[in-house]
Amino acid sequence: MTYEVIIADDVSTDATAEISRFVDGLVICRNQTNQGFLRNCNQAAKAAKGKYIMFLNNDTKVTEGWLSSLVNLIESDDTIGMVGSKLVYPDGRLQEAGGIIWSDGSGWNYGRLDDPDKAEYNYVKDVDYISGAAILLSVDLWKQIGGFDERFAPAYCEDSDLAFEVRKAGYRVVYQPLSKVIHFEGVSNGTDVNGTGLKRYQVENSQKLKEKWADEFKKQCVNDGNPNPFRARERSQGKKVILVVDHYVPTFDKDAGSKTTYQYLKMFLKKGYVVKFLGDNFLHEEPYSTTLQQMGIEILYGDHWATGLWDWLKLNKDEIDVAYLNRPHIATKYVDFIKENTNIKVIYYGHDLHFLRLGREYELTGDINIKREADYWRAIELSMMRKAAISYYPSYVEINAIHAIDPEIKAKAIPAYVYDHFLGDIQEDFAKREGLLFVGGFAHPPNADAVLWFAKEIFPYIREQLPDIKFYVVGSKVTDEIKALEQPGNGIIIKGFVSEEELANLYASCKVVVVPLRYGAGVKGKVVEAIYNGAPIITTSTGAEGIPQVEQVLEVEDDPKTFADKTVALYQDNDRCRQMCEGTQKYIREHFSMDGAWKVIEEDFSR
């Protein structure tokens, strides 16, 4: 990024006066008489020519990415008016992860002297204020406000006041944990509030701040002498809080279940919820954890949470509205404690109905061990559903299977994927596309079975008619058996895990997506994703299960030879491919949009 450095020199007596001899390109604003911190900032800010102005104290040391992370954040959301850094002492302890102003006017540097790497200090959040040692806002907003209010001259509380002014102007004040600044607090103005130095103004100006913003202070969280900062630390008073629990932080580019969780997390944020996320492995996994934290989601990770979660739930039981528990093997670990110790509403999302999927696999294979596994999961899943306020699955097929066993269970079908952005530039010239594509993670057994079946029973028929055709296989955790399918000259190309960008390119360049699933349950995320990407698709009845108005977007066939023939026919019919592609975005808007999904579940989220 381009930037200018303005030195606000308030009649310094050290080597600052000679800095232009050693550093080129500086804008130096040197006062003739000492103005004090506040007026010095106001005066020097007049020289700023850029879009943003960053106030950085002289008693600081910056770290890698400190500035770009602030700029990226403020430019990501036009409701944000001011952003600020995580401040850390030279000894590595935390000085502040945003500031709290209580209703009585008292203030906290949230997290002071704690470990700055703890989860609660590392997500983007609204805050009451950010210490002025490192804050950034637009020059236009700075001018609109009029700079620091000079009633707080020479120093102290001007940063808190500025934050309230930013909110008065209709914008948010937001903390950016990726911007880490080491602050040698007290070097500039000392630490004695009772002495004759500048620090004494801290007490006087606190009273002025309280008087100026008396009406606003009434809306602040209450300090009862031992306050719980759960809401005050992120200005979440009046907002609903949802705790989402899954097996781990969603690896949204690796598997369909993670993508579902990730998209619903985004939807909850969009609908105004404060979102807390708990991965059952308590790990901080990159780049996925930082992605969620930069969205504003607090992730409960680390040994502190592994041992302290139950106490945290008890302490904050009245602050959390909904516990959204994913997958039966995870949800069962938490549901009993939540129901026995809190009034938090439990909503359960099973992802797929395990006993139905395994029952179908047993019917296909006759393996008695799979039948035993299906029976085991049937007991687990039904027990979990009976404990939840309501349970979700991706298709009515699963809901009907549940109600065939127990009509009293409250359950409904919800969209497997939910989108808030729709594609507008899909390549519809199918004469320029080539190859078949399969996408699916191989930790999920139905996907491995599908590729093996296609490669052995279907693809040879296709190659007889289209000898040069390629079959691209994409997915994480590729097994050795899948890798062995790729042989010289056989047209099978095992891509394995690819980035989101490369996957988008494959969707745009491959002609037909095949989803040859022989067993499974519910709506398949890979099918919805392929529709979203405008792909002509051929699948089985299992792959098409739960897809509404399936004839609009899919070709369906279960017989291997006929599947091959239909694939060849579709591959050679560019007009049919284009017709299937043209309707995909309208279809996704109707059936798999965030707003549409919220209409289905909104009534379930009342406390």
PLM segments and residue spans:
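A short, conserved alpha-helix in the catalytic core of glycosyltransferases
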Residues: 65-71, 122, 126-146, 151-182
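Glycine-rich, basic loop-to-helix element that forms the pyrophosphate-binding segment
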Residues: 31-48, 64
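Conserved donor NDP-sugar-binding/catalytic core segment of glycosyltransferases
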Residues: 60-102
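Short, flexible, basic/aromatic active-site loop/helix in glycosyltransferases
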Residues: 85, 103-128, 143
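Conserved catalytic-core segment of nucleotide-activated headgroup transferases in glycan assembly
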Residues: 253, 257-266, 277, 386-387, ...
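Short aromatic/hydrophobic "clamp" motif used to bind/position activated sugar donors
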Residues: 53
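Acidic donor-binding loop of glycosyltransferase active sites
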Residues: 319-321, 389, 508-522, 535
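Acidic donor-binding segment of Leloir-type glycosyltransferases
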Residues: 1-33
